[in-house]
A protein has these predicted regions:
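Short, acidic, Ser/Thr-enriched surface-loop or helix-capping motifs
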Residues: 166-167
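Charged, low-complexity helical/coil segments in non-catalytic cytosolic or luminal regions
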Residues: 1-152, 156, 160, 179-192
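Hydrophobic "anchor" residues
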Residues: 171-172
């Protein structure tokens, strides 16, 4: 299946390197092992999974007393697997089309109508908290776009931790902390 995906900001080897640096102890141990040539640990399994998000291109028009109106544009993201919403606070890379096996894609639980509804519920409190308007501002959803973020799942084996590294933000998290990603990884077809 062809998917619109963010261009990754790191590759699989860099993702594995990031898991070695989670704590000073793990970093020192991995460095010491490699210096002494004692790296008896097997290389971890690395799997790429694709996580769906809707990008909501938003315009807010603030009505300011005694001054002209002010337009502010920003991007919000609606998690297509859980429905969570938040402002995008990173510079987004280019979107490219990739051919991806179906079993590597986290299933979408929220369609466009659901995503728009979640965005609308989130937007009022966000605008109130961010802009502190005196008058109710006008808001509009300029465009809603589905895009997939590549995640590297680094699996050190059954008795060790498994990590999910975002190819967009380079953030490392335990795989179990992202339930839709963990479910997609443990599905038999994705590990084939």
């Amino acid at each position: 299946m062809e998917l619109p995906c963010f261009e990754p900001r790191l590759d699989a080897d860099q993702a594995v390197d990031r898991t070695d640096r989670l704590t000073p102890t793990s970093f020192l141990l991995s460095t010491l092992r490699s210096l002494l040539g004692r790296s008896d640990d097997a290389d971890p399994d690395v799997t790429v999974l694709y996580y769906p998000d809707y990008l909501a291109y938003t315009t807010v028009t603030l009505r300011r007393v005694g001054r002209s109106d002010k337009d502010d544009k920003f991007i919000a993201a609606v998690d297509a697997a859980t429905g969570r919403v938040g402002e995008v606070d990173v510079t987004l890379p280019d979107v490219e089309t990739r051919e991806v096996a179906d079993e590597r894609v986290v299933p979408i639980e929220y369609d466009e109508a659901d995503a728009e509804r979640e965005w609308d519920e989130w937007l009022f409190s966000y605008v109130d908290r961010t802009y502190r308007p005196i008058k109710q501002p006008e808001t509009s959803l300029d465009r809603l776009e589905l895009v997939y973020t590549p995640y590297y799942v680094v699996d050190y084996g059954p008795d060790e931790d498994r990590y999910a590294i975002s190819a967009l933000t380079k953030q490392v998290e335990l795989l179990e902390d992202i339930p839709p990603l963990a479910d997609a990884y443990t599905a038999p077809a994705s590990r084939a």
